[in-house]
Structure formats: structure tokens, C-alpha cells
Amino acid sequence: MGALMIQGTGSNVGKSLLVAGLCRAARRRGIDVAPFKPQNMSNNAAVTPDGGEIGRAQALQARAAGLAPSVHMNPVLLKPETDRAAQVVVQGRAATRAAAADYGALKARLMGAVLDSFARLRTTHELVLVEGAGSPAEVNLRARDIANMGFARAADVPVVLAGDIDRGGVIAQIVGTQAVIDPADAAMIRGFVINRFRGDPSLFDAGRRFIVERTGWPDLGLVPWFPDAVRLPAEDAVDLRRASGGGGLHIACPMLSRIANFDDLDPLAAEPAVRLSMVPPGHALPGDADLVILPGTKSTRGDLAFLREQGWDIDLAAHLRRGGRVLGICGGYQMLGRMIHDPEGHDGSPGSTPGLGLLDIETRMAPEKRLTRIAGRALGQPVEGYEIHMGRSEGPDCARPFAHIPEPDGATSPDGRVAGTYLHGLFSGDGFRAAWLGQFGAASALDYGAGVDEVLDRLAGHLEAHLDIDRLFALAR
């Protein structure tokens, strides 16, 4: 059957969900399908069975396709560490750090890894559905591009262009894309899709005809807004504010500047008994929160300074005085200790940074990243998840571990109101989540994993109702 690529008119136009839904639709047709994204930029990484890293969106797409995630589904992952530099993960392994100004020169060497991973998927699966990054209209990035048209032309993969009508200006998005890209790039596009329409679709019939007349590209369909998308794991930080609920247990989470693996919160956001508040910079932690979760971060020391700049350290102290509780996950756990030592400068400049002092532990950063899937027990319940961090934490409070995986993990304060763990994904386990929420008097009867698959099935049905799926798949080569 071949391969087909979904590119977008911009970031966050719904490419990831379109590919996930198409993967599930292909699977329902009995097609052996695999997702692929040449280059992703995200601190929300998933750990593959062989201990590699890929973007969380590709892990969800793999689930939609009925596959275990593979490092070849996202061969280049950029994990921002500062506004101008990122860690570069190649085929699942951290390869180097690169400043934004230097990354262009590196991309020529990365194309080989991208094409190698793509070839592996293409030879082992009937159909490969490829997701682009950002937009091909970013012509300043076209030279040495590996994420959009540079890849599509190198691998000879036809493209469908997706525009987002919800943000407005979708006619200009699509027509403008054709106007600014190279004619040879435009020739790779086999049609367009309008995503996230609200209201009566017939009201946009004239707009769709105009796009066809101006571009010559076939109209492959208009996809109405899919409200259940909020129940699927988010990858982009831009999606964080969506998390909410109306339950009685109020959980607050500060939006750190380098927040990572925040999909840890998705099972909690799905709980009817939970109200989850994502607290943006410049806002105080809510005084009525029962629990504050300090999430993972790509830069523990940098985000600890950011946390203090927001005054959230003062808010945390007040929260504890009111009888609240605090849980730190990964980098958030490291922040809770007395000191973070980084003599070799693996997380910023060499030196030591005082922590929040809420746990009697100290953390020492190390060059080796612990990257592994684990299973163990916590609160008498089985837990599964993964670790993805640098550094090791030790101290008296580690004598009261948060979990056993099977070795002791994490720490708990003597009064039990402050705890930390290195374990990501622990809330996805229904038994543990129910036991953990039960400590707060909140009940849970949610089957989170089944809920994700139900939404993926509904997403596939939604696309099947509004797109000519068979025509789309016939474009693959």
C-alpha cells in the first residue's frame, strides 16, 4: 500500500489526532499500519519496550495501530532545555545537545537516521502514516528540512495538507501555503482536509470550492470538532490548560517552564471525582487545593528557579500550613529535597542549588540517564510505568519509600503529607489510582485504559463519517 503523510498549515492544527484516528481506522479495516514522525519537539516523551524515547503522540498513534511503540516511529526527538537549546534524541537515544542556531547544520546528518527508520517501518508494515511537524510554509526552515517536504521528497511520500478552521483564516492557511512553498513541494500535495469545524458544514461549502479553484487540490473532507479529544493524552504544552473537571478533590499543578511528561496527569483529569487546575505562570497556587503536584521537568534546577520567581515556593509553604499535601514526580521530586548537586553541570552551570526543603533528601546529578520501564507495588497495589531522569536521590526520608519497583523508590516526609517518586505513568493503573484517591476520600471506578481505546474508536468512526478514508488510503504509495 505504501505511505501517506499528513502535514499541517501550522502547529497544533490536529495532525497528531488525525494520524491517530487514521491509524485506528486502518486497523479496523485489517490493514497493518504503523505511525511515523521524522522529527518531533516535545518534553513529553514515552519510553519504548527496549528503553528508548519517542514523542508521546507517536506512542498514542502506535496504540491506535495496535502496536508497541518503537524508536523508529520517531527517529529524531528534540527535548528543549532552554529557549535556545535542546537535547537531540536519535533513534531513541540521547545523542547530543544543540543550540537552535547550530541545529540546521546537524539536520543533514540526521536525515540518514530518519530515512533508515522509515525504511524499516515501510518494509515491515502494509501502510505507514506519517505526521509532519509545524508547517511546510515555514520556508525559512526549508533548507535541510527533515520534518516536512524535505522528508516527503526524499522518501517520495505523497502529502495531505490539514488546515484548522477553528482558529480562523483556514482559506488563507491553505491557499497561502501553496503560494509560498516551492512548486516542486506543492506538487507533493494530493489534497486538503479542513479540521475542527463547528456548526453547519454547508455554511463553508463556498469556502471549500474556493480553495479547490485556487489551488487545484482535491477537497478530501471537512472534519467537525471532536469534543472527546480532551480525553486523550496531550503532548503539547499548549494543550495543558484544557485539563479540568468538576469533582470535589481539588488538585493543582504549576505549569513549569520546561514541564515534561505531563501526561502523568491525564488519568486524574479524567476522574469524575477530581478537579484538576493547571496553574499558569503569574498566578498563585489556589488556596483551596487539597493536593499540589510538582510535575516532571526537562531542567530541574532551571525550573526550580522559575518556581521561586513565580512565588510558588511561598504558596507551597502556605498550602502545607493549611493541611494540604504535596506530591513531586521525577524533577518535581528532586525539587522537594534539601539540595541538588550538579558538580559537572549536567543540568545548567556546575554547582549546587538549594531545594524546597520539604523532604530530607539530596539529589546528585549524573551524566547517565536512567531510562527504563518498571513494574512494582505501591499502596498495596501493582503499579507500572517508566523512569526517565538523570540523578539519584538519597536521604533519611527515603526510608519511607513511595513505591517498591522492586527496589525502594521515592521518599515520604515523617507526617506523610509530602512525597516524591521517580515513577512516571503510575496513575494510569486503575487499582493504584483508586487506592491513592481513596486517601483523600475520593472514589474511582474509572477504567482509564479502556477509556482511551474507546475514544480512539470513536475518533476513527468520526473520521470515517466525514472523510473518504478509502480514497485517502488509496493516495498512499
Curated annotation (Swiss-Prot):
Pathway: Cofactor biosynthesis; adenosylcobalamin biosynthesis. GO terms for biological process: cobalamin biosynthetic process. One of its GO terms (molecular function) is catalytic activity. Transmembrane segments: none annotated. The keyword Transport does not apply. InterPro entries: Class_I_gatase-like, CobQ/CobB/MinD/ParA_Nub-bd_dom, CobQ_GATase1, CobQ_synth, GATase_3, P-loop_NTPase. Keywords: Cobalamin biosynthesis, Glutamine amidotransferase. Residues 248-432 form the GATase cobBQ-type domain. The active site is at 330 (nucleophile), 424. Catalyzes amidations at positions B, D, E, and G on adenosylcobyrinic A,C-diamide. NH(2) groups are provided by glutamine, and one molecule of ATP is hydrogenolyzed for each amidation. Belongs to the CobB/CobQ family. CobQ subfamily. PANTHER family: COBYRIC ACID SYNTHASE, DETHIOBIOTIN SYNTHETASE. This is Cobyric acid synthase.
